[in-house]
């Protein structure tokens, strides 16, 4: 059984056989669901918690609303 991976940028589940696996020079493996996520993280150096359409942003927003 093949396990589903989560996108390293937006946190969305990636179906087996789809997406992009990116390996950094230091050996870290990053999984991306789309070219949009890959470009935002690799080329534009954006942090997921500051981009409004990511799961990490929404989780942080919920935490702020509770306090």
Swiss-Prot record:
Q: What does this protein do?
A: Binds to the 23S rRNA.
Task: State any single GO MF term.
Answer: zinc ion binding
InterPro entries per UniProt: L24e/L24_sf, Ribosomal_eL24, Ribosomal_eL24-rel_arc, Ribosomal_eL24-rel_N, Ribosomal_eL24_CS, TRASH_dom
Residue ranges the record marks as coiled coil? none
CDD domains linked: Ribosomal_L24e_L24 (cd00472)
Q: Which family does it belong to?
A: Belongs to the eukaryotic ribosomal protein eL24 family.
Name used for this protein in its record: Large ribosomal subunit protein eL24
* Classification via NCBIfam families: PRK14891.1-1
Q: Which controlled-vocabulary keywords does the entry list?
A: Metal-binding, Ribonucleoprotein, Ribosomal protein, RNA-binding, rRNA-binding, Zinc, Zinc-finger
């Amino acid at each position: 059984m093949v396990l589903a991976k989560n996108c390293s940028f937006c946190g969305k589940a990636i179906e087996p056989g789809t997406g992009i696996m990116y390996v950094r020079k230091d050996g870290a493996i990053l999984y991306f669901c789309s070219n949009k996520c890959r470009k935002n993280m690799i080329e534009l150096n954006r942090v997921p918690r500051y981009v409004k359409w990511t799961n990490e942003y929404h989780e942080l927003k919920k935490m702020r609303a509770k306090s």
